[in-house]
C-alpha cells in the first residue's frame, strides 16, 4: 500500500492510500490484473519504496519485481520493464544522478551469486547498462551510492539461507557474523573486473 499527501499553497490538499495492484495483490483482492510485461521474478508486491524518475512515479521492491507505474493520485497504471530492457530484479533504493538524470540500481535475487549494477536512462525508457559483479553467494543488497566517477556497491554479510527458505521464512536471509562487510568501488564505465573491494 502507498500513502500520499498532496501539499498545495501551504496546506494538505488530500491524503490518499492505495494498494499497488501487483499480480499478488490482484489475486488476493479479486481485482483485475494490472497490464504490462512480466518476467520470471515479477511475482512480488512492489511494496518497499516509491520513487520518481523521468516524470514517472514508480513503486518498487527489493530482490525482484515488478516495477509498477502509478498516477499522481497513486492509482496503479501498469507494470513496466523499461521497454523490454529489464529482464530481472530491480531495487527499492536506486539513486538518480543529479547531473545526467540517469537512475543507478544495485539489484539482487536469491538465485544470483552476484550483484547486478543497472543504469536506466534519464528518459526512463531503457536499461542502458548492466554489469554483473560476482560475489560467490546470494547477498542482500539494500542500497547503492554514486559519486561523480564511481558507484559504491554495498556487500554486507546478510546472505540468502536455503534452510530458512525451506522452513518457510518469508525473508530467508541471515546475518553471517564471521564474514566481513565490503564496499565495492566500480567506475561508472567499468566492468566487473574493475571493482575494487
Enumerate the language-model features and the residues they cover.
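Short, structured patches in soluble enzyme cores that scaffold and shape functional sites
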Residues: 107-110, 119-121, 131-135, 145-148, ...
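Well-ordered mid-protein domain cores that form the structural environment of catalytic cofactors
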Residues: 17-128
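Conserved beta-propeller blade repeats
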Residues: 92-95, 139-143
Amino acid at each position: 500500500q502507498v500513502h500520499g499527501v498532496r501539499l498545495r499553497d501551504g496546506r494538505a490538499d488530500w491524503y490518499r492510500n492505495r494498494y499497488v495492484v501487483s499480480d499478488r495483490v490482484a489475486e488476493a483482492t479479486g481485482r483485475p490484473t494490472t497490464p504490462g510485461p512480466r518476467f520470471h521474478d515479477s511475482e512480488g508486491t512492489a511494496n518497499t519504496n516509491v520513487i520518481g524518475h523521468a516524470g514517472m512515479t514508480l513503486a518498487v521492491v527489493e530482490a525482484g519485481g515488478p516495477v509498477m507505474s502509478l498516477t499522481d493520485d497513486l492509482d496503479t497504471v501498469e507494470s513496466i520493464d523499461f521497454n523490454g530492457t529489464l529482464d530481472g530484479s530491480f531495487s527499492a533504493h536506486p539513486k538518480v544522478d543529479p547531473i545526467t538524470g540517469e537512475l543507478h540500481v544495485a539489484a539482487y535475487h536469491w538465485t544470483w551469486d552476484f550483484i547486478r549494477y543497472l543504469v536506466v536512462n534519464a528518459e526512463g525508457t531503457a536499461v542502458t547498462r548492466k554489469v554483473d559483479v560476482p560475489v560467490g553467494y546470494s547477498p542482500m543488497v539494500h542500497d547503492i551510492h554514486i559519486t561523480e566517477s564511481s558507484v559504491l556497491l554495498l556487500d554486507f554479510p546478510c546472505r540468502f539461507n536455503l534452510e530458512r527458505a525451506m522452513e518457510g521464512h518469508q525473508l530467508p536471509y541471515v546475518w553471517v557474523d564471521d564474514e566481513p562487510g565490503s564496499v565495492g568501488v566500480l567506475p561508472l564505465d567499468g566492468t566487473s573486473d574493475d571493482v575494487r573491494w
